[in-house]
From Swiss-Prot:
Function field: Required for transposition of transposon Tn903.
Further remark: Transposon Tn903 codes for kanamycin resistance.
InterPro entries with a match to the protein in the record: Tn903_transposase, Tnp_DDE_dom, Transposase_Tn903
UniProt organism field: Escherichia coli
Protein name stated in the entry: Probable transposase for transposon Tn903
Amino acid sequence: MAKQKFKITNWSTYNKALINRGSLTFWLDDGAIQAWYESATPSSRGRPQRYSDLAITTVLVIKRVFRLTLRAAQGFIDSIFTLMNVPLRCPDYSCVSRRAKSVNISFKTFTRGEIAHLVIDSTGLKVFGEGEWKVKKHGQERRRIWRKLHLAVDSKTHEIICADLSLNNVTDSEAFPGLIRQTHRKIRAASADGAYDTRLCHDELRRKKISALIPPRKGAGYWPGEYADRNRAVANQRMTGSNARWKWTTDYNRRSIAETAMYRVKQLFGGSLTLRDYDGQVAEAMALVRALNKMTKAGMPESVRIA
């Protein structure tokens, strides 16, 4: 089969969105500047926080977008304030590192309503280890540390609805219930690959009344009658000898949009985390997701098939 060809129909708008990604005021907007310092009355004893959670979030987002270290991000933001003639200071890099362990970074979008199709996948983000070239030439060393980023993406808008970071030894199916519980929006169907073909995942989808589009593994058997979605997939597999027809008829192939989201993460922000503490790494990953959702909202390509 010849490769399909598509034409972008909103190139002018999308091109402006791509250019806007490099704008400093796109990431450091008036809302962040006005709420830079903490104004709320402290609810506990001790020294009050000087900088707001939004300020810490903004620093972490800029750090990821421009691929800076914490020290470089501090100097970068201070220079922006100087050029803007704004009487603000960037939080000290040690303050950001400490606050990142407890800050709650929101990546929720303003989109509301039913989600027709949620697609789910995970990818690895490296914390420690050699680059691919060294591994190719000399082999890998023993110490290689990874974290797993789990994403649930709206297949229509490309917005990340749910996100979580886990240790490398946490399986996709184990992380699934906590991931899907992050949203209370109605979801019509959810797609995931064969790694999620477990009762734990299917039970969570049944609890939320979501149609499960998870391909059963080769030679899979039937489950009790309440797992109707899976049993239909198993029956189709036995009739045709594979899951190919089932994937085509159920629109399962839309799950590739989750892989597109993973590709965007690696291409735009790199495939590694730099903070040393695990809680800080969670904040760094959520800042990454927040930045990606902001880019998505600014503009995405719209295309039509031409061949």
